[in-house]
Amino acid sequence: MADRAALEDLVRVQGERVRGLKQQKASAEQIEEEVAKLLKLKAQLGPDEGKPKFVLKTPKGTRDYSPRQMAVREKVFDVIISCFKRHGAEVIDTPVFELKETLTGKYGEDSKLIYDLKDQGGELLSLRYDLTVPFARYLAMNKLTNIKRYHIAKVYRRDNPAMTRGRYREFYQCDFDIAGQFDPMLPDAECLKIMCEILSSLQIGDFLVKVNDRRILDGMFAICGVPDSKFRTICSSVDKLDKVSWEEVKNEMVGEKGLAPEVADRIGDYVQQHGGVSLVEQLLQDPKLSQNKQALEGLGDLKLLFEYLTLFGIADKISFDLSLARGLDYYTGVIYEAVLLQPPARAGEEPLGVGSVAAGGRYDGLVGMFDPKGRKVPCVGLSIGVERIFSIVEQRLEALEEKVRTTETQVLVASAQKKLLEERLKLISELWDAGIKAELLYKKNPKLLNQLQYCEETGIPLVAIIGEQELKDGVIKLRSVASREEVDVRREDLVEEIKRRTSQPLCIC
């Protein structure tokens, strides 16, 4: 048995090595060599008839969430939802799966990541890729032209996930969108304000919101000499500039996508620029870009946007970044993406972006794709990358070794002597009926020490102790678990006293 266990360990390690090489896109020869080693080890292992072949695990790119993790997630959701409601949003929900043709042609090169389903009824279906396209379909179906809504739900992507960095195949998105015909840039500015409010409230670190405009990108590509047919594919290359160097992006555009080197160089002169409203004003004077109608419209709107952002007090958090491209096909105007910053390695250097935590933009043409008459409904919105935020919060709590409360129980109903189960049940029923979050131990005669230990382990702040003397006196002994202080409270006053002592918002830690 020991030899077999050792072989199983070798097979597992070799299997992980093969998977790692595939993810790193190693050479075919190297992968084949390691696969051969794996097959040789499996052959040595031979069949094990007594061992079940089924491996109990979650599918790739998914995970279970423990009560501790869910407590953190609910706290994050509460912050996000309260902000959405503060800005007047209504909530909607849509099906997890859509007709395949609803999603087709909306995501550019990312369309290959859509999960398709087989349906016995004959319909071609796909799992939703995001919450934006289903929202546009909802508007068109219901002939709505004006709504401010939020939607928090799971979406699905057939990706190669890096779960350690908060990337999955099944994950939550938290979306806020404003649909309707309004004066320019007012809804867009509010979306950026919401993004900043949420990220500041979550206290996950310094962040920067990059903004650009799809019209500026398209105008820039046009004056640089990019053929119309290559706009979107070149756009997806530029969008990688936050992850790889300009040289790598240029090599992809020239080598893989057939763009002329001199055209790529002209693009490079623009997309490596970033700044504030001064850069917008500089580009408005650019002799070539200012002659392009689309780019001029985009720059004019960005200038107005910065005026509103200054009034909202968040202009210092915003950077006009010409490399921001956002690969999705449906964006038509302003686009934005929030990244967390890590401190510079040396004095004088700029902080580095370490990952997107929110993004969004304007998509005025998406609803028209679903309307029989092509009627457009202007829309702008944002999506909070909650999975990455969850990962950051969890890592921070682990590093600080902070205890997380997994329940909101305010009080444990306990007894100091035996044969008081009926009294405990009567009291806890009174507390539940009064809206108090209460528990008791499921034993007829639990020891008082065990009841107090349970409170310390689970973070319950108060214990309501029933004893024979307390019953005679018509009082309940209320004990603070933290201070161990005990006071007698008249039974009719107990509910109000518990509410008074636990009126502070419950913390996750």
Swiss-Prot record:
Main location: cytoplasm
EC number: 6.1.1.21
Subunit structure of this chain's protein: Homodimer.
Pfam family, one: WHEP-TRS
Modification type N-acetylalanine: residues: 2
Domain WHEP-TRS: 3-59
Top-rank taxon, per record: Eukaryota
Family per similarity comment: Belongs to the class-II aminoacyl-tRNA synthetase family.
UniProt source species: Bos taurus
Protein's name in the database: Histidine--tRNA ligase, cytoplasmic
Keywords per UniProt: Acetylation, Aminoacyl-tRNA synthetase, ATP-binding, Cytoplasm, Ligase, Nucleotide-binding, Phosphoprotein, Protein biosynthesis
Role of this protein: Catalyzes the ATP-dependent ligation of histidine to the 3'-end of its cognate tRNA, via the formation of an aminoacyl-adenylate intermediate (His-AMP). Plays a role in axon guidance.
Enzyme class: ligase
Subcellular location: Cytoplasm
Catalyzed reaction equations: tRNA(His) + L-histidine + ATP = L-histidyl-tRNA(His) + AMP + diphosphate + H(+)
NCBIfam families noted in UniProt: hisS
InterPro entries xref list: aa-tRNA-synth_II, aa-tRNA-synth_II/BPL/LPL, Anticodon-bd, Anticodon-bd_dom_sf, His-tRNA-ligase, HisRS-like_core, HisRS/HisZ, HisRS_anticodon
GO biological process: histidyl-tRNA aminoacylation; mitochondrial translation
Gene3D superfamilies associated with the record: Anticodon-binding domain, Bira Bifunctional Protein, Domain 2, S15/NS1, RNA-binding
GO molecular function: ATP binding; histidine-tRNA ligase activity; identical protein binding; protein homodimerization activity; RNA binding
Modified residues (Phosphoserine): 66, 356
Positions of L-histidine binding: 130-132, 157, 173, 177, 326, 330-331
Cellular component, GO annotation: cytoplasm; cytosol; mitochondrion
